[in-house]
């Protein structure tokens, strides 16, 4: 569903905000734009699939680490093509992680400083990860539907495709 929303988004909506932030909001306004929400979703999917601590993780180029430092923003909106390539890479990473998942890896404790010292297992982190992707895919799909994007582009996806774009 995330891929459907990404592919279906027309150029005029790519930099539109899904919500308006209050003037005292601490995050830059682009954090509410379609392209950024897509990036945000993929960034966290990638990080959580790695199970790595943040200091051991870096998103692939051209992406930068903006999520925990709102003062650092991308110099430009990422393109649909860049984000589609990132989506394809994270899908491959997801497949690899799931097919290689062992009981030991599933139980491995994962901690992040922003999680307020609430360590979780790698498997629980992946369940959270799935909910997070689903939440933002639904937001993006709703936004597109509100802007009269044809329903066929936003159909429910009952099962993952074998390959992105297929």
Located regions from the model:
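Short, contiguous alpha-helical
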Residues: 3, 12-69, 112-166
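Acidic/histidine-rich alpha-helical segments that form the ligand environment
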Residues: 70-111, 121-136
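Residues that cap or delimit alpha-helices
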Residues: 10-13, 102-103
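Hydrophobic core segments within long, regular secondary-structure runs in both alpha-
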Residues: 3-6, 46, 88-91, 95
